[in-house]
Each structure stands twice: as structure tokens, then as C-alpha cells.
């Protein structure tokens, strides 16, 4: 069956105008996650912000209680004892000038990037490479830190970085279709709570405007925002 026909069939039984309670929405999404691989469950949160204004930027990191189901490759820019700590904590790639050269050459072998503060003048050279990928280390989300071991373990243990996009939307993977409904709901509520706590001072009016959940290959299901309150 062609992908288009599969999507049309998957939409059957979903009221496109209804706002579902989060548990009901997840049930519908899981029932329609029928691909031959373990689909990622994704959340899209529309916020009442304009990220073009610095005082309306929303970003942060949250550790999902049940993990993401994905194994992240973690790269760390550090020297000496901190480099050793990163390796011991399970970092996939650790280096300093040597790692900068590798990344500048277009070889990025990590999904999350962490750096000690003293490395940032060096890492700053990679802004044009890491910035567009959303991978530039940032102290606000704990990826510029002296606690490299804790940051590596957090990344490996299910922490998710979120950042509002130009259209005012935050999108994040919160688990796999193989997760139980209960675990997915817990993860989504944890993400929503972190997004609410990251509300910027410049946000006006309704902050969380729309929420939808979907699987990698499945249709979106609209969610009643109030059902995300823990």
C-alpha cells in the first residue's frame, strides 16, 4: 500500500477537529504506528511567542522519566581530568583542538555536544557548523559545564533539549511506539511541564496554544492542553 493511502487509512477514526485528552490521543497514535520499525512518538507544542524577539525565546532541557528509547551519541570538548571524566561517563567522542578540526572537516559523530567553560573560545569557531544543527553548547541548558560526567549521563539517560522554532513551535521525540501508554503520557507531561517553566518574561496572552502528538509515519492527533497538567 502506498504511503499516502496508508496515511489516509490511519486517519480513519480520528476526529480532526476534536481535542483529545492526552491518554486517549496516545492510544490513537499507538494503534496507528504500524510501520516495520519502532516509530518515534513526537509532540508538537504551539506557543504564543515570537522567537524573533530575544525576550520570547524558549529553550531548555528535561530528563524524561522513562527515557527516549534512543541512544544518543555524545561529544565532549574537554582537556585533562575533565576529558577523562567524560570518557568514564560514557562519552562517544572526546577531544579539544583535534576534535575541532574533525568537526570543521564536516565529520560530526555525535548527536549532543557538551563542553567545559574553558573550551568555549575554541568551540566558538564551530558556530557555523553546530549552530544550524542546534548542537552548540549552551550554559542555559547545561551543556557548558564543569560537571561533564553528569551532563554525559543525563544525555545518555534520556534528557531532551527543546527550543522554539521560528513559527513558535517546539517539537520533540518523547519515546517509542513500543513504550506503554502510561510511560508515554508521563514523558509528555514532563516535557510540557518543562516548557511551561521555561515561559519567557516577554510572552503575552495564552502561552500553550495548541498541542498535537503523532508517530513517525502516522497522522497527528490534537490534544486538549489542559490534560497535560500533572
From Swiss-Prot:
GO molecular function, one term: rRNA binding
Keywords noted in UniProt: Repressor, Ribonucleoprotein, Ribosomal protein, RNA-binding, rRNA-binding, Translation regulation, tRNA-binding
Alphabetized Pfam families for the sequence: Ribosomal_L1
GO cellular component annotations of the record: cytosolic large ribosomal subunit
Coiled coil: none
Biological process according to GO: regulation of translation; translation
Function: Binds directly to 23S rRNA. The L1 stalk is quite mobile in the ribosome, and is involved in E site tRNA release.
PANTHER family, per the entry: 54S RIBOSOMAL PROTEIN L1, MITOCHONDRIAL, LARGE RIBOSOMAL SUBUNIT PROTEIN UL1M
Family that this chain belongs to: Belongs to the universal ribosomal protein uL1 family.
Assembly, per entry: Part of the 50S ribosomal subunit.
Protein name according to UniProt: Large ribosomal subunit protein uL1
Source species taxonomy: Bacteria, Pseudomonadati, Pseudomonadota, Alphaproteobacteria, Hyphomicrobiales
Gene behind the chain: rplA
